[in-house]
Structure formats: structure tokens, C-alpha cells
Design a protein with these regions (language model features):
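Short amphipathic beta-strand segments in non-cytosolic proteins
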Residues: 6-37, 112-120, 124-128, 132, ...
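Short Pro-Gly-centered beta-turn/loop motif in secreted/extracellular proteins
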Residues: 33-62, 68-76, 275-277
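Short, conserved beta-strand segments of beta-strand-rich sandwich/propeller modules, principally
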Residues: 50-52, 147-151, 280-282
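Short, solvent-exposed S/T- and G/P-enriched segments that are highly enriched in secreted/extracellular
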Residues: 24-46, 137-138, 265-271
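Surface-exposed loop/turn motifs at beta-strand-loop junctions within extracellular Ig-like
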Residues: 56-60, 156, 287
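Long, low-hydrophobicity ectodomains and other hydrophilic envelope-associated domains
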Residues: 8-18, 22-27, 48-67, 88
Length: 305
């Protein structure tokens, strides 16, 4: 609660009855509130935060007005979802990464996806070089050339920190598997961080190689295969979109949280929705986890609050 940057906020809200007047508050649980001349008065309100005006009833919390952002300049920006003008959302996370998760995940930047027909990768070609950090990567392979060996080659000083690597043959939605190959061992000889963890289906486990640079992990498919798509995940906190999990996306409307569409099973590491614009959103992972956070969407990116 940032009282050092606080401002006084008078929010003009329609008061439905005397009972509601006594029960008004603005979520994130403001410490001080009250009614003054028909207006809700909140003092020492922190900036750069989204607020949800609600009131209590016997049935729980009810929306009183649209959410709003109090920006760094003290300006109120109302987040009233527009159902007539919808926007396309591409969602990669349900919760923002911590500084540590971001720092560990960035070790993938500069890493390479390579393919070869020789076991020593002396004839390898680089299919993709990771230019920037993302929560997860969904890569369409444009070359039609078939290769037997595929791998992820660590970035410089990256310790080959990769959590998951999934291959799909062209025009197939089912992963293809082969023999796991790559650098043997792990940092400090930890059996929980060996190369096999990259293919265990658990994004919270990862390969931590015994050497900072030059380590790699991949698969020998036993024959040349035409890979059309790869999904790979850097070292992560588990709050990205997880394959096979069921998700629900909500937006804050006149009746509170409203489900967009219905539950959706993640077939990729990005979820796409057509949603009301200028709204406040909430993405739930129904399958697991507890960390979730509201967000807005601007310039093609999620902005968590």
C-alpha cells in the first residue's frame, strides 16, 4: 500500500440505496473509505493500480461501477469493456514472472534449434535462434527437409536451461518421440536436472547442464523425419500456458466476472480469444495452480496489475 505516492480519490458512483451506501468499498481492500455528500471518498490511494468498486450484500460482493486504473499521473482511466468493438487477445501467461523467474528464463536467449543427419551434428543447420525471452515458444518449421537428429543447443553460459521440448511431424497434432540424446550429467551431478527432464511433460523440471556453454539436448528419431512444429519452454515458474490444461477467460462486465466462451483445453502455449475491448481480464487455469492476476491488454501484450 503505497501511501508515499498516495492521492485522494473521489469516485462518483450511483448509490443504489442506503444499505449499499454503508457497504461500499473498492477492491484491493482500501484501508480507509467513507461516504461524503453522496460520493465515495478514499484517501491516500496508491497510483498505478487498478481498482474495482464493489459493495457487499448478503450474496457477497457486487459490482458498483466499472473498474478503473489510477495511473502514475493520478488520472483515472475507466476500464469499461466494449462488447461492440472486440479485440483479438493472445495470452501467454496467467501471472507475471518474478524477477528470478525472468532472470532464469532469459538463459534461453541466444540458444538454437538445430537439425542434422549425422550424430555429431557436423552437418547441422540452425532452424531457429532465440532472439528474446518468452514464457514459451511455438515454432513453425518452414523448411521441408527431413532430418534424423534434432536438438536444442545452449546459449553462451545458458547451462542448457530448458524445461520442455516437443516435436510435431508436419500436418500432425500428436507429438513424435525418439531416443533422448545430449550432454550427459548435470550441474553438481543432480539427478533431478538431467537431460531426460526436458521430455517428462513437467515444465517445472529442467535440464541444468554440467557446463555453461556448448551443452545440448535433443532426440534421435531413428530415421529422417519432417518436423513441422516445435514447442519449447525455458526454465519457468509454471505460470505460462501449459499444454493439456483447461483454461477459462473472464472479463469484468456489468454483472461482475463474465466467462468468455467456455472452458478451453490448451493445445498450444498461446491461447487466442476474441474479447470485449478496453476491459479488465482474468485468466484461470482450472487444472492446477493458484497464482492468477488481473490484466489489461494493450499493443498486443498482457499488462498485469
Amino acid at each position: 500500500f503505497q501511501t508515499n505516492r498516495g492521492v485522494s480519490l473521489v469516485q462518483r458512483l450511483a448509490l443504489q440505496d442506503e444499505r449499499n451506501r454503508r457497504n461500499k468499498l473498492s477492491c484491493i481492500w482500501l484501508l480507509r473509505y467513507g461516504i461524503h455528500r453522496g460520493k465515495a471518498l478514499f484517501k491516500n490511494v496508491a497510483r498505478d493500480i487498478v481498482y474495482l468498486p464493489v459493495y457487499y450484500t448478503s450474496d457477497g460482493l457486487k459490482p458498483l461501477a466499472s473498474p478503473f486504473l489510477l495511473d502514475t499521473d493520478g488520472k483515472v482511466i475507466v476500464l469499461k469493456g466494449d462488447t461492440l468493438n472486440r479485440q483479438q487477445l493472445k495470452l501467454y501467461r496467467k501471472y507475471p514472472p518474478s524477477d528470478n523467474a525472468y532472470a532464469m528464463g532469459r538463459r534461453i536467449v541466444g540458444g538454437k534449434i538445430q537439425a542434422a543427419n549425422r550424430a555429431d551434428f557436423s552437418d547441422s543447420v540452425t532452424i531457429y535462434r532465440v532472439p528474446e525471452w518468452k514464457s514459451a515458444y511455438s515454432l513453425k518449421v518452414t523448411t521441408d527437409t527431413a532430418w534424423r537428429y534434432w536438438r536444442y543447443l545452449s546459449a553462451e553460459n545458458g547451462l542448457c536451461n530448458i524445461a520442455e521440448l516437443v516435436f510435431y511431424q508436419r500436418d500432425s497434432m500428436r507429438p513424435i518421440v525418439g531416443e533422448i540424446i545430449g550432454t550427459e550429467g548435470s550441474c553438481f551431478n543432480d539427478p533431478n536436472h538431467v537431460k531426460e527432464k526436458v521430455f517428462d511433460g513437467d515444465p517445472l523440471t529442467f535440464f541444468d547442464a554440467p557446463t555453461g556453454s556448448g551443452a545440448w539436448v535433443g532426440m534421435d528419431f531413428g530415421k529422417e523425419v519432417n518436423i513441422g512444429k516445435l514447442i519449447f519452454i525455458p526454465r519457468t515458474d509454471g505460470n505460462m500456458i501449459q499444454l493439456g490444461d483447461t483454461y477459462e477467460l473472464y472479463w469484468w462486465g456489468p454483472e461482475g466476472w463474465q466467462l468468455i466462451g467456455g472452458p478451453r483445453i490448451a493445445r498450444d502455449v498461446v491461447l487466442e480469444y476474441l474479447a470485449p475491448s478496453n476491459a479488465l481480464y482474468w485468466l484461470r487455469d482450472v487444472s492446477r495452480g493458484r497464482e492468477e492476476r488481473i490484466f489489461t491488454y494493450s499493443d498486443g501484450k498482457q499488462i498485469f496489475w
